[in-house]
Every structure is written in structure tokens, then in C-alpha cells.
């Protein structure tokens, strides 16, 4: 009965993806921003994990944490330098080889950020270590190819284009052998304004639309999204400096095999009473979600976020970096903590980078394009974060 209730919540195409995945088929789940890719992916992960060894991976640490998995690089010991070839794929330790050899299903999230040599690198690493290759297991990939693309410098890009016809995973040598069934979700759940959705799709497909000119303004409204981190830092510094009162500093506790960039928290958090902050996790009682924006309050040693006139306590949160291990007793692969950052799960919320905003939703957004977008998909991701056109402002000159 419970399973039927879950399936009843799905759209027709979500249900199609769910059914194909549970039948063991290779599936490429695509779709516009806000169509429920993450929601249905997590349903599939939970169901497949009951009867198979499923490894869930993503190209970045933050994306891996968001989907509840590990990074591609840590799982398959992928080299972080150069275009991946058979000769520079790593021989693995026995415990890592046991993990890879036991994988029945591999799900890769944020596939738009995966280069062709990364997918080939996974396959070649598996084969080099005597394991089943990608063409011998179930592979599910999830993401919107019109959103954020792999970030690389010009030298690396030219190296990659000497071997491949393009820069995304579909140009990998292994791609055609996987024979993906493609499901594209097209029912947008984040926005309901049809005209707005139509013009978002024009931008998504690389076109230009004069529709967005009417949102041009000189003043900000809501959270600022910007392509460049330097712009984000200026807004957040200006917002913090505008607050009077004492500056409070909280350093994170980091331990294990990890680095600061593996997490979405601040290694050094600086806040003042009254400053604008964003909550970065889902609270246990679901009163706060990742992306909730409010006001920072400090009462004695206690920290709070004020939302809609109500104050919620902020406690330090342990964010874990995990890697897969093989449990010989259960013959299952399991996620094991290898490092962690413990910090208050908040950050200044006057501005955030477009890259960091992927997957988030806001009622009011100012898109600051005074420094232009530098990567494919940035403009579309920025525009599509807002729930309604009435909440959108665009700045092109400061």
C-alpha cells in the first residue's frame, strides 16, 4: 500500500523513469529546472538500495552531499589532472576494488558537469582493476544538459577536444555502448506562469528573449545571484558592514580526509546581529529547509535565525564527507565517513554564486550581470531560481 501511495505522487514521465530504473534499465533522466529530478531520483535510490548494491556519485563534493552519495573521484580514484587514458587510471587497493566490483547500479547526479573523459575514466578504471565495466552494470545519469557545464581552463579544453568531439559526457567512448533510455521531465513545478516558463525555455535552448528587459532595474530585491564569486563577496561584505554592533566569528572544526571545498559551510563564519543569513540544511522537524533565508539573532551564547517573526535555534551541524566501503558480512557497499566539518549551518545571504544556487528556489531574486556569465547554462540557472516573475530583478550595470 505504501509503495502505491508513493507512485501516485509521480507525474507520467517521473513514473516512466521510476519503472525503467526498477527494471534494471540504463536511463538518462533529464529535464528543465524545477521539474522534480531530485525528488524522483531519491525515490529510485531508496527502492533500488533494498535489493541491489547502488553507488550514488556526483562530480563535486557539495553535489555528492546533496544527493546523499560520494564524489566520482573518491569512489573510482580518478586522477585530477590531464585527460584520462587507460594508462593513467589507477590500480586500486583491494578494499577499493571490492567496492567497485560489487556495484550493481551506478547513479551519477549533476551529469551536465561530467566531462567525457571522466565517464571513460570510470569505465577504464573498472576494467583495469578486473571489475565489470560500465557496459556490464546498470547506469543511471541525472541532470539537465542546459544547466551548468564542466568548468575548465582553455588549455585543458583544447587538450580534451583533441581526443573528443565535444566536452560533455555524451561524447565519451563508452556512451553509445550504454544505450540509455532518455526521459525528459517537462512539467515545471517551481514556476506556474506560462509566459515566464516559455521565455525561460528560450534562454535554456541558447536563444535570446527581449521579454526579460522589463525586469531591468538599478536596485536589488531579495537575494542577489551573480556569475562571479568576487561580485558575491562584495555584496556580502557590504551587507555585513552595514550592520552596526559586534562582529561574531565562528571557526569550523574540520577533521579527517577532506578539505574546506568539500562542504557548503563556511570555514570561518562572520556574522552580526540583524544580518541576512541562509540556512544550509534541512532541520530535523522540517521547519527550516536548505535555502531558507532569515535574519541572524544572538541571545547570550545562543544563535537563532528569525523567519517571519519567529525565531529558530541554530545548532552546530556535522557535515560528513563519505566514501564507499564493501561490507564482507552483508556483501553490500556502504557509505563510510572519512572526514567532516562541524559548523553552524548558515552563511551570509545578501548574495550567492549562480553555481552554488543550483537546486535552490527563492521568492525574490536579483540577477547581477554587471560581470557577464562565463559558463554555459549560468544565465538559465540564475533566471530559473525564482518562483515567480514578480520576484525577479536584473541588473546589468552598477
Q: In which residue ranges do the predicted regions lie?
A:
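Conserved ATP-binding/catalytic motifs of P-loop helicase motor domains
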Residues: 1-398
Amino acid at each position: 500500500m505504501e509503495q502505491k501511495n508513493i507512485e501516485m505522487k509521480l507525474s507520467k514521465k517521473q513514473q516512466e523513469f521510476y519503472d525503467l530504473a526498477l527494471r534494471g534499465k540504463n536511463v538518462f533522466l533529464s529535464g528543465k529546472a524545477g521539474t522534480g529530478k531530485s525528488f524522483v531520483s531519491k525515490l529510485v535510490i531508496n527502492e533500488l538500495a533494498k535489493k541491489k548494491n547502488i553507488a550514488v556519485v556526483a562530480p563535486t563534493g557539495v553535489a555528492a552531499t546533496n544527493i546523499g552519495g560520494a564524489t566520482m573521484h573518491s569512489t573510482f580514484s580518478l586522477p585530477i589532472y590531464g585527460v584520462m587514458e587507460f594508462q593513467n587510471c589507477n590500480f586500486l587497493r583491494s578494499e577499493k576494488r571490492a567496492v567497485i566490483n560489487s556495484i550493481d547500479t551506478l547513479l551519477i547526479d549533476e551529469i551536465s558537469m561530467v566531462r567525457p573523459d571522466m565517464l571513460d575514466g570510470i569505465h577504464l578504471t573498472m576494467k583495469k582493476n578486473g571489475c565489470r565495466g560500465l557496459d556490464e552494470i546498470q547506469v543511471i545519469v541525472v541532470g539537465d544538459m542546459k544547466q551548468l557545464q564542466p568548468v575548465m581552463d582553455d588549455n585543458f579544453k583544447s587538450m580534451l577536444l583533441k581526443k573528443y568531439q565535444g566536452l560533455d559526457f555524451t561524447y565519451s567512448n563508452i556512451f553509445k555502448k550504454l544505450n540509455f533510455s532518455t526521459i525528459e521531465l517537462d512539467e515545471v513545478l517551481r514556476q506556474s506562469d506560462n509566459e515566464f516558463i516559455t521565455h525561460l525555455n528560450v534562454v535554456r535552448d541558447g536563444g535570446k528573449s527581449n521579454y526579460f528587459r522589463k525586469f531591468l532595474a538599478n536596485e536589488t530585491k531579495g537575494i542577489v545571484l551573480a556569475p562571479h564569486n568576487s561580485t558575491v563577496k562584495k555584496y556580502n561584505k557590504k551587507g555585513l558592514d552595514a550592520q552596526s554592533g559586534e562582529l561574531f566569528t565562528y571557526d569550523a572544526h574540520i577533521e579527517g580526509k577532506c578539505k574546506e571545498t568539500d562542504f557548503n559551510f563556511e570555514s570561518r563564519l562572520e556574522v552580526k546581529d540583524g544580518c541576512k543569513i541562509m540556512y544550509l540544511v534541512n532541520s530535523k522537524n522540517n521547519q527550516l529547509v536548505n535555502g531558507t533565508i532569515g535574519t541572524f539573532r544572538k541571545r547570550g551564547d545562543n544563535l537563532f535565525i528569525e523567519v517571519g517573526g519567529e525565531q529558530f535555534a541554530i545548532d552546530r551541524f556535522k557535515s560528513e564527507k563519505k566514501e564507499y566501503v564493501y561490507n564482507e558480512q552483508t556483501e553490500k557497499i556502504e557509505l563510510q565517513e572519512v572526514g567532516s566539518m562541524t559548523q553552524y549551518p548558515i552563511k551570509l545571504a545578501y548574495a550567492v554564486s549562480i553555481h552554488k544556487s543550483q537546486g535552490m528556489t527563492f521568492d525574490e531574486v536579483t540577477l547581477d550581470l554587471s560581470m557577464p556569465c562565463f559558463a554555459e547554462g549560468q544565465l538559465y540557472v540564475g533566471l530559473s531560481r525564482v518562483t515567480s516573475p514578480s520576484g525577479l530583478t536584473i541588473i546589468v550595470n552598477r
